[in-house]
Amino acid sequence: MQTKYDLSTMFIHSGRQKRFSQGSVNPVLQRASSLLFDSIEDKKHATQRRAKGELFYGRRGTLTHFALQDLMCEMEGGAGCYLYPCGTAAVTNSILSFVKTGDHVLMSGAAYEPTQYFCNIVLKKMQIDITYYDPLIGEDIATLIQPNTKVLFLEAPSSITMEIPDIPTIVKAARKVNPNIVIMIDNTWSAGVLFKALEHDIDISIQAGTKYLVGHSDIMIGTAVANARTWDQLREHSYLMGQMVDADSAYTTARGIRTLGVRLKQHQESSIKVAKWLSEQPEVKTVYHPALPSCPGHEFFLRDFSGSSGLFSFELTQRLTSEQVSKFMDHFQLFAMAYSWGGFESLILCNQPEEIAHIRPNIKRNLTGSLIRVHIGFENVDELIADLKAGFERIA
């Protein structure tokens, strides 16, 4: 497909070539382990092109997988896309593809908690050194790069506290010291389209497709879209690690992407309205929504992102007691308590300052009030605000 089209058009038409759709609107759902060859010559041809979208063996993918991979590459401008069973698998296998014993990794100190645990447990067991940096470090990232630094891992915005790093400055400073460093980003919040990672000289853009790509909280999948420099190594290492996703999940993810454009617009509109309302409430100390000036790195968001999604957090003026947490959290009518996000439904979680400090031992944010994370779904926004208002009344 021609890349001159707007994203909203591309979401609809990419990954729907006749080879994938066989004449139907959607790509076919092809479930297969064994894929049949008509002749020795056919088998030889498939073997030679097994990494290039040729049907070879189920673990390499079927037409269903190829259609989604084509769509993802079109979306994010990559040379290739690998599919994983969840977002964490995409993160961990992307890192593992480029490190060995004795190497060094630079990891955001505000990254997703399981990503940090992977570094502290698995990578350290492999005798790979980790240095955690403050996502607001900017050009000083250069001072942390060592001769054996192989991977620089970014996340934008940061998990829970929502900082937006100065990504172009960080990338430029890192490349100046080590042009060959592999730079990857957890790009889930932007759905890979609100921030175009590969256009900012990042090598690999990773998503928990479980969230916005699927969009309905019913499938788990991870994606990693790589540039030409890193694609072959990422693909082969991930394949050797046995990473794959079933055809049904790939099919459902591609179907979810068809409505991604309209969903992101609604997430943005509703979340900003809720965030602005929260910023005016006496119970709220600070709102950490990248689109609001109160969020650290807001100026970088305005410069580098084309829009926002539905996830943000806000700090209360007080640390809630255990009794207050229950009163506040247990009685919402529209907000549900759950991990993950990115679906059509609104979600809420509460973290205490000491809990944030525990999962962020390498950076300090000096939170004093309870930190509430919300994902704003597609309910009527005034009714969501009323639900939050009732929550504040319960802890008054």
Swiss-Prot record:
Q: What is its main location?
A: cytoplasm
- Gene Ontology annotations for the cellular component aspect, listed alphabetically: cytoplasm
Question: Which Pfam families does its entry note?
Answer: Cys_Met_Meta_PP (PF01053)
N6-(pyridoxal phosphate)lysine occurs at: 211
Give the pathway annotation. Answer: Amino-acid biosynthesis; L-methionine biosynthesis via de novo pathway; L-homocysteine from L-cystathionine: step 1/1
Output the InterPro entries linked to this UniProt entry: Cys/Met-Metab_PyrdxlP-dep_enz, Cys_b_lyase_bac, Cys_met_metab_PP, PyrdxlP-dep_Trfase, PyrdxlP-dep_Trfase_major, PyrdxlP-dep_Trfase_small
Query: Localized where?
Result: Cytoplasm
Name listed for the protein in its UniProt record = Cystathionine beta-lyase
* Species of origin: Haemophilus influenzae (strain ATCC 51907 / DSM 11121 / KW20 / Rd)
